[in-house]
UniProtKB/Swiss-Prot annotation:
Catalytic activity: L-threonine = 2-oxobutanoate + NH4(+)
PROSITE patterns, per the entry: ACT_LIKE, DEHYDRATASE_SER_THR
Residues recorded as bearing N6-(pyridoxal phosphate)lysine in the entry: 56
Role of this protein: Catalyzes the anaerobic formation of alpha-ketobutyrate and ammonia from threonine in a two-step reaction. The first step involved a dehydration of threonine and a production of enamine intermediates (aminocrotonate), which tautomerizes to its imine form (iminobutyrate). Both intermediates are unstable and short-lived. The second step is the nonenzymatic hydrolysis of the enamine/imine intermediates to form 2-ketobutyrate and free ammonia. In the low water environment of the cell, the second step is accelerated by RidA.
GO biological process, one term: threonine metabolic process
Domain ACT-like per the UniProt entry, residue ranges: 339-413
Keywords, sorted A to Z: Amino-acid biosynthesis, Branched-chain amino acid biosynthesis, Isoleucine biosynthesis, Lyase, Pyridoxal phosphate
Binding residues for pyridoxal 5'-phosphate: 83, 189-193, 315
UniProt name for this protein: L-threonine dehydratase biosynthetic IlvA
GO molecular function: L-serine ammonia-lyase activity; pyridoxal phosphate binding; threonine deaminase activity
Amino acid sequence: MTVKTTVSSKDIDEAYLQLKDIVKETPLQKDHYLSQKYDCKVYLKREDLQWVRSFKLRGAYNAIIALDEADRQNGITCASAGNHAQGVAYTASKLNLNAVIFMPVTTPLQKINQVKFFGGDNTEVVLTGDTFDDCLKEALVYTEENKMNFIDPFNNIYTIAGQGTLAKEILEQSKDNDIQFDYLFAAIGGGGLISGVGTYFKTHSPETSIIGVEPAGAASMYTSVVLENQLVTLPDIDKFVDGASVARVGQITFDISKDIVDDYIQVHEGAVCSTILDMYSKQAIIAEPAGALSIAALDQYQAEIKGKTVVCVVSGGNNDINRMKEIEERSLLFEEMKHYFILNFPQRPGALREFVNEVLGPKDDITKFEYLKKSSQNTGTVIIGIQLNNHKDLGHLKANVDEFDKSNIYINENKMLYSLLI
């Protein structure tokens, strides 16, 4: 028996019929703020408004319903950093199936709780491993030992076809309003979304350029397709964009992406954070890091999209409110607005006032001041955080700090110190 390893637009049409009464047809909205900002027409496909607040329900349900009834009754498993897990849990509850869901221990608490909420009594959550890839190994061993069915988050043709149904929605919604897209931007984690959406667009809207967007610290598809021309595993990844931080993409998604993705963009995690804050403050859109990737990529394509029509897939909105402080911190660091130093600071009254007057600009602010070590001498070791009013003042700030203490250490340029102290 030949195992099918690719996906066609017909497969996506069939998945669409399967999912029609299960998933929500999410809005395709023109974004006036982004359109004005980039001097083009920007539309957002709002998968953050899906039942489980991400597109992953589409692929999960389609892959599970494709199993034989007997296989489904044996139970299902999955490995996921959150959104695929919610899709599997939702489906397990809907179809009254037993599900065991493996999630990395680094998964935001909000996503873990949502999986339990959607799955109810049908779902057991197992936290294991620091990354998705570590978690995946455990899930596969458990699945084989217990003769259950593993629902792959991306390397599965039914998962990919399910994700592709949002492309069918986009094109039907745009046809109703006579819209033709020049560019489509979508996030890449394991590659299921870009493979499904890209496949459908290449068949029904071949003039649209497909742009895949990855976190700079986890660009596994770009590395595999563009740099190495073979499937590779990244030795280390930045896990912050948890919904798209995958060390190794799927063989199926790799093969499809090679043919249908026109360009790959890597976005710095700090830029993702700035986009999250911008979308929330300007438009009250709550995007998770992976959900903000497609919009964050527009900065790098500003010249190309000017005067064009663009659609960005907002792939998810499962953002843990407890992460907002970290998101703001990463954004300020990326925008070069926040800076940390270790200084020898005078231990006498009035020293801090002198520092403010001599080192800071009139609108700069001290956000952190902490003695690392006090001594009986005239000075103590201090860590100080400074937020600038204008990032262009950094050179002036550094010069003033050097004059205050020539032996100072600039922590922003030392990742090890930053991770230990901030």
